[in-house]
Amino acid sequence: MQGWHTTFLGMRGLPRDISDFEMKAFFTFDGAERDAINARRGDSHKLGLALHIGFLRMSGRLLGAFRVIPVALWRHLGNELGIAAPEVASLRAMYERGRTLFDHQQVACTVLGFQWMSEHQRRSLVRELRDEVAGCDRDQLLVRARQWLYKNKLVIVHERAIRTLIAAALAQLEVETGTAIAASVDPATLDRWRASVSELRPDGQTQQSWLWAAPAKHSTRQISEVLERIDLLYTLDVHKHLADIPDLILRRYARRLVSRPPSAGAKIKEPARTVEVACFLRYCLFTTTDQLILMVQRRIADLWRQAAADVPATVNWAAMYKTLLGELVALSAQGAVPDAELRARLEALITETQKRKPPSRASLVREGLIDGIRPVRSLLVAIAKLPWQATGEHPAIEYLAKLQALYLKGSRKLPVEVVAPSLGMIWQVSISSPDRERAFQALEVATLFALRRAVRNGSVWIEHSLSFRGRARLFFTDERWQAESKKHYARLSLPSKAATFLKPLLARVTAGVDAVAAAARSGVLRVDDELHLSPLPAEDEDPEVTKLRAALDHRIGEVQLPEVILAVDAQVRFSWIMLGREPRSTDELLMVYAGIMAHGTSLTAVECARMIPQLSATSIRQAMRWARDERRLSQACQAVLEFMQRHPIAATWGRSDLASSDMMSMETTKRVWQARLDPRRNTPSIGIYSHVKDRWGIFHAQPFVLNERQAGVAIEGVIRQEKLETSQLAVDTHGYTDFAMSHARLLGFDLCPRLKELKQRHLFVPRGTKVPAEIAAVCEANVDVALIEKHWDSLVHLAASVMSGHASAVAALARFGSAAQGDPIYEAGVQLGRLLRTAFLADYFVKDAFRNELRRVLNRGEAVNALKRAIYTGRISPAQAKRVDEMQAVADALSLMANIVMAWNTSQMQAVLDRWSNRRQVIPPELIGKIAPTRLESINLRGVFRFPVDRYADQILPSRPNASITGTNG
């Protein structure tokens, strides 16, 4: 079911206005439906039955009201059936006989296969709602219930009956959660929990507000405050309870608690109060632990950066040369030395100089780390107390425990017997140093960096965390995988044996390597120590395209942003999707728009209130809190994209299965703990990673930390879009790794990276393969096919876990990044990824059309980023950037605003082209395909916003009493 169809489900009567697309979708009939219609006697009966069939297909309900029947629909039905449409009054007169109305309703149900819900199906619906209740509010559950009924060919019942089922599901969830809490937590502890959240702190704020607050920065003081929160939660024994309650349920009740002022908590009745408080404290422990680990990782990175800043970038060869010259001068000054002895001394000096190896920069940085460890020792003392876990023995945990024991003794000298070889040979010399105080500092640094690496690859974890749990949590359990593996292999369309998968891939790699060698022989490619590819020539602007663009701009004209939003909403009804129903008033509709604009532009709630005089800043803040919940904005964004792709012009823009993804940095302030310094603009920023279709439009957006690998986010955006099929995703260098290329292929699509570094353009073939001499410098025969075959099942196991939603691609790629080197699954994925990269690069090197295609789709991503920058012109406020869910709302709202602008431009361009086509003025598709829907020149994004709602009331607010009625009323 498409997103745009959802808004029609459950409608009680026909809308006052219906588009041509909707009439064709719902009121066009196939053979069996036509036979049933033509079996009726009389044109009125035929039209009436056709109306019932179309309405049931559109809304899932039976049509019982005939107050409004649009003229266009009545005319369309007549043309569809080839009969003259009579007056609507005759239809109403016919249905005054109840038997006729009932008969037509029953025939419509029979033809479309609908039936009334049975008691068994009602219980199934309650179970479905029970599964969805943790992640949805009441209005969204109402939509899910209607979708479930429609998909199962059940007539959608009255809204009141569905809301009764929703209330029962919510009550059942609350009772089950309350029972589980009461069974695992003693009453005295629950009393302590309830009392603790309402206690006042010395600064006047409640414990509830303090626990929920996000850190301002990643400073030592902020880390200490986060540790203080964890200590408080440990004091309350939160870490000992509620381990069996799912994370989604914890999140639901925690967010419900913080949505109200702390003073309102006393008014909440039991067991709801206990459920909310318990889930809130447990969820706070999860999020605070994640914050601590991220801040510690950032602090360690800062420690390395500060040490590296004091070390010269390269070896000072000039100083070494001067030293050698000085020694030579000293020898030559000794005139009394015989020539033979002088020659021997010179040879010895040269030999000694050649053996003298300057220290590497990394070793100098490590020495600087050892010297500078004291300022972060208190941090190491604190994190040593946390309950770190590992599968089996792990050196990071072992030596963290030894350091903790030494801290408790107050000792700052390392015992002689501690040499810590398992922490790595690079630290061995420093830890074995005779200076045991310095050896102690070296052990601290080695343990700190070993812990950082282990947390990144998932070999060490903390159980009460959302993002840093063990790597085993990424996979299905072994029992489940053994039972369901065949189903997942089939779902991923993968063979059970790696050899079957590798055979066509190896043939493609061999053919690709031969093609690259042929291109090198012909001079198309230049190979020395690296492979050099000539840049594609820039495309010249076609004068006909410029002329067409100017003509379209002239016909479309200028418009205000409110007009654009209303025009798109009238077609898509994204406000209905966000609300889960029709807006009840104009003010509620404006609050939806204000919530989108306050998140999707740099306007604050106060500034939005100035631009929308009908609303207050308080109501806009309320709309912002509501809009960012439960991914409402992303659902609306998806619906607008579907509307945009329906236009015929979209087919001229490119392929439907090709997309690109890229990150855009958004400036913020230093008082945001997840902000990183943008290397280009040297400002604190947060990244927003967006996926753009080749046919334009954003289909996924996600906030991301700058300077991190983006491959996981790139993959996540594709696999979470079930309605869009993407076979190739173009990314830049930061959006790929070898493991990510193999993971993406197992998930059903190809990563196509535009590689910046020449070293990344090397080709790889299996061991023992003969490499053509022309490309021997850039082709390595070191791929271990046997390793891929050995761990094939584990690679598919991980892909199936990600595809099913058991784990996210972001988490999987974070655990299987460079920190996982040496892990057999990681190494197998890298080997497979190198083969896939070779096959891709071979096409990229020799096929200019393929290169042009990737350049085009990546440029479209950049153009969309430019559009988003024009919409969001300022900084992201600290209030919106401190929590992931708030940043997700910014990303989704900005994508929605950009999609609205592109959808409006698309519809206007299509309307102009249709008018020209009606006048037999045909425009070649190759010219239309070069006109982008990202124009902003004629759209005013600023000023006082006046929304002409009355102009679009028939489509957006059809049930409003004072809305003008369009259509035929008899």
Swiss-Prot record:
Q: Organism's domain of life? A: Bacteria
Q: Does the keyword rRNA-binding apply?
A: no
Cite the InterPro entries for this sequence. Answer: DUF4158, Tn3-like_transpos, Tn3_Tnp_DDE_dom
Any Pfam family hit? DDE_Tnp_Tn3
Which positions, given as ranges, span the membrane?
none
Protein's GO biological process: DNA transposition
What GO MF annotations does this protein's record show?
DNA binding; transposase activity
Swiss-Prot/TrEMBL keywords: DNA recombination, DNA-binding, Transposable element, Transposition
What is the annotated role of this protein in its UniProt record? Answer: Required for transposition of transposon Tn5271.
Family per similarity comment: Belongs to the transposase 7 family.
Q: What is this protein called?
A: Transposase for insertion sequence element IS1071 in transposon Tn5271
Report the source organism.
Comamonas testosteroni (Pseudomonas testosteroni)
